[in-house]
């Protein structure tokens, strides 16, 4: 009988253990968190000065019941915000790893992504222009990621430098790595602009040189520390681009034309300037100047330079000069001289010398751009563009193309794309006020108009395709 009662007592204990008891066994329903990352982007792109906004709450779910949530946003592995909505004022360029941690009292979930803060001026067509009263303007049309061009943005300098007053009479523009150099004749100076943000970084002036009025710059797009700045009177100054100084040039001491040509190959630059006193080419390699007189003068007589441009890519160049109303073409190797096996000069390395019949007459002031790929020179007079092939002994009598969609158009500057497939043309109408500048893009091979942009600048001074 005692065993009977013992069995009943044990069964009772087991029955008690069947009741719910949260204190001994964890049977509470866990409210797990999930983030619908498939509905969110892995990468976000924003331009500088734009804002990234992400409200994470619509993408968060809790499995059992809604519990209070906490949020932690990290940017570049550092705490950024504890709000449910992320706001990033995009100022610093670059790519930043991002993460949000969403938690309740039971669990946490994570969402990771990348934020790319890009320059709105990374790569594209850049136009420097001047109004009737000399006011300068920088316009920019962006190259989009898919290869197509965007729309022109005007007044880029004033917009990105509030309160800064820029000088009048801009004369030239050149890029060196991450910087854009713009020269001004009024209040003579060179302004150094960040090429990606168009923010002012430095102002280079030389009040100690009263005749410093920069009209052209020969500036390599590399890590070179110095460049050539040609003043209005033909005097050359040394532009120390890294230090931001204007110095007297101790090698180029003559008087030079603003017509010049340069390219940068290997370790040394190749500068070709025209000495207006000696009527000859001066070849400057960054260290020494050579006036090409070792075997007698290359040009007999008082030739005046009209154009200097590349002939065969990184191999030869051509000089067009005028003498007594006639135009002469002289093509030389980049090194000017023939060398023997001991690298001694043995004579002038002429590639071609001939008289060119000029109709219409080509002038030094005519906007020009050369294409070594197509072996031709494009030049403009009024609203007409002409194409002259290097092999021809006469200039064309008929235009290659004409700007005829607007009246009274005058072409003021030309440039060519880096791959030489497109010609960029800047024109303006003097009888139109305000933003009276027009940009045209032509196919280099066919002359077909690819696109045109109206009222996107003042009178164009310089046009260039700015690469990254």
Please provide the spans of the model-predicted regions.
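Sec-dependent signal peptide recognition
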Residues: 2-9
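C-terminal motif of bacterial Sec signal peptides marking the signal peptidase cleavage site
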Residues: 14-17
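Acidic/polar, low-complexity intrinsically disordered N-terminal segments immediately downstream
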Residues: 19-160, 164, 428, 432-447, ...
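Surface-exposed, polar helix/loop patches in the mature regions of secreted/periplasmic/lumenal proteins
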Residues: 98, 103-112, 117, 195-224
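Short beta-strand elements that form the blades of beta-propeller/WD-repeat-like
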Residues: 122-133, 139, 171-185, 191, ...
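C-terminal hydrophobic structural anchor segments
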Residues: 122-127, 397-429
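Surface-exposed loop/turn elements that mediate protein-protein interactions on large endomembrane-trafficking
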Residues: 137-160, 185-211, 233-257, 276-304, ...
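Repeated scaffold domains used in trafficking and secretory/extracellular systems
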Residues: 159-177, 207-226, 248-270, 293-316, ...
